[in-house]
Amino acid sequence: MMDAKGRVWITQYVRPNEVPGWCLEGSDNPFADYYPIQHQRESRQVSYYDPETEKFVLIDTCYFTHHLQFADDANDTLWLSGSTEAIGWLNTRLYDQTGDERAAQGWCPTVIDTNGDGRITKPWNEPGRGASFDPNRDTRVVAGSYGLVADPEVGTAVWLSSAQYPGKLVRMDVGESPPESCLTEVYEVPSVLDPMVPTDLTGFGPRGIDIDRNGVVWTALSGSSAFASFDRTKCDVTGPEILDGRHCLEGWTIYPTPGPTIQNTDPPVRADYHYYNWVDQHNTLGLGENIPIANGSNSDALLALMPDTGEWVVLRVPYPQGFFSRGLDGRIDDPNTGWKGRGVWADYGTNAVWHIEGGKGTKSNLVKFQIRPNPLAH
């Protein structure tokens, strides 16, 4: 991901898998003292490439990383997903000032306020089959994390997707004095596991995740091939039922994506596959602001949803070019030239390039999408 200085941030290996001692029990690091990393072999950290110096800068992290996303805050916070036990972040402004990777990073375990006092306190219930549960304590969960996005309305909060069946959205607000102020919420995708949910409103398999400027979260359900939105403002985030994440069905809306269904599936599972999704917050495509778009990875398309009407706009890359997309993003090159100065870019995932017309040696591509305000617009 690119920052405001034009540097490109990457999650990558920067050291052998063994986690440094300062991340573990017995360290004087405040985050390790609060929650020492349990998995002592973590295989990916973070780096950035600076085009001006043409150099990579390697930054060690205590926690495993996978996806990365900047927050819109004064610290240029870089949120990092991937760890099954903690959510991590890097204060890139502090790192630029000091070069101190230990002081600039933090992490928190995913602990839910199951005793309802509005804060997380130790000791807490630990996860695990057969583990005892004390309702007077808070509860740590192994949520897992894949996609993530910062909350534009709450600068200290981040959302993540977990694909553990049927899938969950995880929200962590680190508060004003982390790690002690960190607090996690979990919301399970409505599924056939919950008898309260009608089968036609179920889904599973969130991967991609993004958010609109109003704080509504959008996730593409890669398992059931649907788009789901989640509005936390409709929820009561307290009570004993918050542990299983089924306490806010009213926050969810499921939008089945267009296309054929797989034969003999009940409830119907669509044949398309949505590797990731993105929300066009700033009208880079031309359909308006806050338009959610899913990768139609199995349908040679991007699928844009008009949330006010439920109408789908299918942006198909015509045969025989083929188009197996795994991600997309928007860019405004010139805000003063109308539709010509903006567009959405999507990639060809390299893992299926050899299935595209052309056979062996066929290379991946980028595709630019633009929508004119009318067919004759110039």
Task: Say what each PLM segment does.
Residues M1-K5, H67-N75, A131-G155, T202-N214, ...:
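Structural signature of eukaryotic scaffold interfaces centered on beta-propeller domains
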Residues K5, S43, T53, T65, ...:
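Surface-exposed loop/turn positions within WD40 beta-propeller blades
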Residues R7-T11, D76-S81, A157-S161, V216-A220, ...:
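Conserved beta-propeller blade signature
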Residues I10-R41, T84-T110, L160-R171, S224-G245, ...:
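Short, conserved, GDST-rich strand-edge loop motifs in beta-rich repeat architectures
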Residues Q38-Y63, R93-A143, E176-T202, K234-W278, ...:
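Surface-exposed loop and turn segments in beta-propeller and other repeat-based domains
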Residues R44-Y48, L68, A86-I87, L148, ...:
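Hydrophobic beta-strand positions in blades of beta-propellers and related beta-sheet-rich domains
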Residues D50, N91-T92, D173-V174, D231-R232, ...:
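Structural recognition of the beta-propeller blade-terminating site
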Residues G88, A226-S229, Q321-H378:
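Blade-level signature of beta-propeller repeat domains, shared across WD40, Kelch, NHL, RCC1
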